């Protein structure tokens, strides 16, 4: 099954961006996933292709118009009946590895990238998109956030990462969703620092136990909420 994505944006030239490189780019070439870009401005009705207007009630910034957004969304939904409609917004559910995995199991995903002060609330009320956030900070628009979500999803698709065990052992995927253990490679000694002896022992059980312990310690120190399930 190909993972298909439609992006709604006023800056179509931003895509595929960094998704055209490395693992995601190779997967795009192999058609493991595909990308459709819809320019929201093409659904505007005036000669200036206006997509925003001043907010009712006053306030700073501009708001994306519901009539223009609605026409663009209707166009996509009519072509993709079973799509999962997502809106990138700081007020959405915080994106995590579990959500990334869930999205890869859906054949088609549509992502609306907001700009300015966001979209008119009526768009949210009518289409009830899955509102997603990548963190508690503000970007200039939803496009970078959408790329982050897609990058996390694409690398989970079969055939993208050659050694799929490396994906399964990463942070948030490893041992119940906790942080990954520390990694080491050659040289065995760098400056005054040596690789932990257990990793050189060849004893796979001891190595596995060490990694599990290191993951737990690292998670307890840096992200204790993951141990309590508070970040689900």
From Swiss-Prot:
Its main location: cytoplasm. GO terms for molecular function: tRNA (guanine(37)-N1)-methyltransferase activity. Gene3D superfamilies: 3.40.1280.10, tRNA(m1g37)methyltransferase, domain 2 (1.10.1270.20). It is found in: Cytoplasm. Disulfide bonds: none annotated. It catalyses: guanosine(37) in tRNA + S-adenosyl-L-methionine = N(1)-methylguanosine(37) in tRNA + S-adenosyl-L-homocysteine + H(+). One of its GO terms (biological process) is tRNA N1-guanine methylation. Pfam families: tRNA_m1G_MT. CDD domains: TrmD-like. GO terms for cellular component: cytosol. It comes from the Bacteria. Keywords: Cytoplasm, Methyltransferase, S-adenosyl-L-methionine, Transferase, tRNA processing. Belongs to the RNA methyltransferase TrmD family. Specifically methylates guanosine-37 in various tRNAs. NCBIfam families: PRK00026.1 (NF000648), trmD (TIGR00088). Homodimer. This is tRNA (guanine-N(1)-)-methyltransferase. The gene is trmD.
């Amino acid at each position: 099954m190909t993972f298909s994505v439609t992006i709604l944006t006023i800056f179509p030239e931003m895509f595929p961006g960094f998704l055209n490189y490395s693992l995601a780019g190779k997967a795009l070439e192999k058609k493991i996933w595909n990308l459709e870009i819809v320019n929201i401005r093409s659904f505007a009705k005036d000669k200036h292709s206006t997509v925003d207007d001043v907010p009712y009630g006053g306030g700073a910034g501009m708001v994306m118009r519901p009539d223009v957004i609605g026409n663009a969304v209707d166009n996509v939904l009519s072509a993709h009946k079973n799509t999962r409609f997502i809106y990138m917004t700081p007020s959405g559910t915080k994106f995590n590895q579990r959500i990334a995995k869930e999205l890869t199991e859906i054949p088609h995903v549509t992502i609306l990238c907001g700009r300015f002060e966001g979209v008119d609330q009526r768009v949210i009320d009518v289409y009830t998109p899955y509102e997603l956030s990548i963190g508690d900070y503000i970007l200039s628009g939803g496009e970078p956030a959408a790329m982050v979500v897609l990058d996390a999803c694409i690398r989970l698709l079969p055939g993208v990462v050659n050694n799929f065990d490396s994906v399964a052992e990463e942070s948030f995927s490893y041992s119940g969703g906790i942080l990954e253990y520390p990694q080491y490679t050659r040289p065995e000694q760098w400056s005054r620092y040596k690789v932990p002896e257990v990793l050189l022992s060849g004893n796979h059980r001891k190595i596995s136990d060490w990694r599990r312990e290191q993951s737990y310690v690292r998670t307890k120190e840096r992200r204790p909420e993951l141990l309590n399930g508070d970040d689900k």
